């Protein structure tokens, strides 16, 4: 009878070890959501750290893609979001009007609308996940937006990272596209 008890104890210990290892592994899996915005829902991907200090606000980085891009950021945003989550920082990546999974017309891709979308995203993250200090990372046109967000947006940001930011609106020289309402796109 003693060998069975010993075997049962060893099995219980093994299960506890497996459970502990599983619980201690960071769970920073990205989650695709839609965030309510002023012009409709904003397709986004959030990535949260596995754990954060209790009672402390969670820092947030908003990743802003470039002209005709999407929230994947040419494949650079996902690894960046994973690294930030592993270091206790939440991220959200969004698709601006006419880009990625956005159902809005591309004519709505303006700096003012992009800033309004970032406002909606920051407000949502604060209300839903208790995020606090916020930084913006912007690539290309997203970098242009990030540089202007302190004047255009409603939320304070503590840091800006500009990744090859666009100069001007980024649309100069593209007149050959002959897009209807091209003048409406900033």
Language-model region placement:
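Short beta-strand immediately N-terminal to the catalytic nucleophile in serine-hydrolase-like folds
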Residues: 136-138, 163
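Conserved alpha/beta-hydrolase
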Residues: 81-103
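Catalytic nucleophile-loop/oxyanion-hole region of alpha/beta-hydrolase
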Residues: 73, 99-131
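Short beta-strand element of the alpha/beta-hydrolase
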Residues: 56-66
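The alpha/beta-hydrolase serine catalytic core
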Residues: 32, 42, 144, 151, ...
């Amino acid at each position: 009878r003693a060998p069975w008890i010993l075997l049962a104890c060893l099995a219980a210990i093994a299960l506890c070890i497996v459970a502990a290892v599983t619980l201690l592994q960071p769970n920073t899996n990205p989650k695709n959501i839609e965030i309510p915005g002023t012009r409709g829902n904003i397709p986004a991907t959030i990535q949260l750290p596995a754990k954060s200090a209790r009672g402390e606000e969670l820092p947030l980085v908003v990743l802003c893609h470039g002209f005709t891009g999407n929230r994947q950021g040419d494949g650079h945003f996902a690894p960046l979001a994973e690294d930030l989550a592993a270091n206790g920082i939440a991220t959200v990546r969004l698709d601006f009007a006419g880009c990625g999974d956005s159902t809005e017309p591309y004519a709505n891709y303006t700096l003012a609308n992009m800033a309004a979308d970032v406002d909606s995203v920051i407000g949502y993250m604060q209300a839903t996940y208790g995020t606090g200090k916020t930084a913006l990372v912007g690539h290309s046109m997203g970098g242009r937006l990030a540089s202007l967000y302190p004047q255009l947006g409603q939320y304070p940001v503590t840091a800006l990272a500009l990744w090859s930011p666009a100069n001007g609106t980024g649309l100069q020289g593209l007149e050959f596209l002959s897009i209807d309402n091209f003048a409406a796109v900033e």
